[in-house]
Amino acid sequence: MANLVVRKCDGSHDVIKDCEQKMAAFCTMDPSYIEYDVDGRPHNPNNITAHQVDAMNRALQTRSPVKVWENHGLLVESLEELKAIDTDWDLIAMSDEEWDTNVKGKLAKLYQRVMRANIGASSGTKVLHLMRPRLVAIADSVVVNYLGVPTQHHVECALILAGEVRRIGRDEDNASTLAKVRQHLIKASVTESNVVPSACRIIDALLWMRANGLKRPEKAGYHRLWRQMGLASP
């Protein structure tokens, strides 16, 4: 069984077990995979539309009015700060040099452009992940709190989270786990429309399921599901 070792911001560790089976269950049983990851894909990778905002709100239970995005001038044919972000950049796979000298700064500019009044780190990264699924880590509050990421400033929060997800994914054992998970999803044919979650998204989903199960074990649907499947708790 493939495990993911998580080192949090305070130095403590956690282990997420049975990652292959849990991600397969996520892709087949969690509506957000279809409604967000699959249906929310953009036609133009540099053009955020109401479709992405609606997909986020519907699937991830976010409340971010389309009008707010329109008022901030974000729903335009080509957002320059987004255009500067290569669609092939991969948060986990890129070298430290490329991340530090080229990508991190451009990602910060994109976050500064998007995260305005009434668009925080959570909703901002959820929409931007659809535009750059290999690069943008989702700053969901459950995951942010689980890892212990500071939340005072939206841009800083999103960038720190990206660094934490990158560190988790670049661990040698975790990299092996992520490769096994992707291979399992492809082999098991559990994904839709050839949308196999990126390494970044796999980490996000596993962290979210783990954190949600720890936070509300008596209410978390995944906690019951794992028991039924004979897997380790979230």
Regions found by a protein language model. Name each.
Residues M1-M115, P133-P234:
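An N-terminal alpha-helical hairpin/helix-loop-helix interaction module that forms a charged
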Residues S123-L130:
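Short hydrophobic alpha-helical segments that form membrane-spanning helices or hydrophobic packing faces
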